[in-house]
């Protein structure tokens, strides 16, 4: 079965910026989904901030294998209830791909537990993304680097946790460098942060970027059944111990009593 993927877009500049509309007439989310649907292994649909429940209902998320997130101007407009909902699904095994300015999204900062801050400059400068982990599944089919003629610069320090893997490192025309492709795991869910994606440049029309995102969806897809009880913390009775066991010492909790949270 194809990997069920939602491309979530903030859809703000897509509607109110003529520059963005000229590059992505149907919105960035639609352009990304269309490129993903070129793959026989992916079935991509879209959701936007303005949809009811931001397009991320419990039922829809329950049937989603990978969620792609792009946000910029309206991070604080995302309801905390939806952020909690997405986090639960990531813990259960849904993959999450966070693009560009999504580093400041509520969901990414919550999952990272850090400010996710960085330095930046909007000057249309050249970016070269070096593949520093060439055997990683996310960069298969790519050359030694991806070159983008125009990009918004992101610079270090990038206040995120040390990743499981650093897949790409960017060099910018102005001299800065940035860790541009980072992998994480939270609970059963795989997370990939990918730096490029400023809305005033046709980055999501770039063939290398399109290939990388297809690879990233396949990497983030967890084939195992969802870990539905990931939040449960049962009190296991002494009678269920695997070896003979005698209770010793004073106790705080009674048999069958739930733990404190």
What are these regions (language model features)?
Residues 6-10, 99, 194:
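Short hydrophobic segments within beta-strands
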Residues 74-142:
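A glycine-rich, often tryptophan-bearing local segment used as a flexible ligand/cofactor-contacting loop or short
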Residues 213-228:
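Short, hydrophobic alpha-helical segments
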Residues 2-22:
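Short glycine-rich His-centered loop
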Residues 16, 200-208:
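A short acidic/glycine-rich loop-to-helix N-cap element
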Residues 17-105, 255, 259:
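Helical hinge/lid and interdomain linker segments adjacent to catalytic or ligand-binding clefts
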Residues 10, 71-72, 197, 221:
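Cell-envelope and extracellular/periplasmic
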């Amino acid at each position: 079965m194809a990997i069920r993927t939602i491309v979530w877009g903030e859809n703000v500049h897509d509607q109110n910026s003529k520059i963005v509309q000229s590059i992505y007439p149907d919105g960035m989310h639609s352009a990304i989904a269309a490129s993903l649907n070129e793959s026989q292994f992916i079935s991509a649909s879209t959701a936007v901030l303005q949809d009811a429940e931001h397009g991320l209902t419990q039922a829809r998320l329950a049937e989603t294998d990978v969620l792609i997130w792009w946000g910029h101007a309206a991070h604080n407009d995302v309801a905390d209830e939806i952020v909690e909902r997405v986090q639960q699904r990531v813990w259960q095994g849904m993959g999450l791909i966070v693009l560009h300015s999504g580093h400041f999204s509520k969901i990414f900062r919550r999952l990272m537990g850090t400010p996710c801050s960085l330095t930046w400059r909007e000057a249309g400068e050249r970016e070269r993304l070096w593949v520093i982990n060439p055997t990683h599944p996310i960069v298969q089919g790519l050359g030694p680097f991806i070159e983008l003629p125009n990009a918004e610069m992101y610079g270090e320090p990038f206040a995120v946790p040390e990743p499981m893997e650093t897949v790409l490192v960017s060099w910018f025309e102005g001299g800065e460098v940035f860790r541009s492709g980072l992998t994480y795991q939270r609970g059963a869910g795989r997370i990939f942060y990918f730096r490029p994606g400023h809305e005033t440049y046709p980055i999501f029309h770039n063939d290398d970027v399109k290939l990388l995102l297809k690879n990233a969806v396949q990497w983030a897809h967890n084939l195992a059944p969802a870990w539905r009880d990931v939040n449960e913390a049962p009190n296991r009775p002494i009678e269920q111990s695997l070896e003979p066991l005698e209770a010793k010492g004073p106790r705080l909790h009674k048999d069958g009593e739930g733990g404190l949270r």
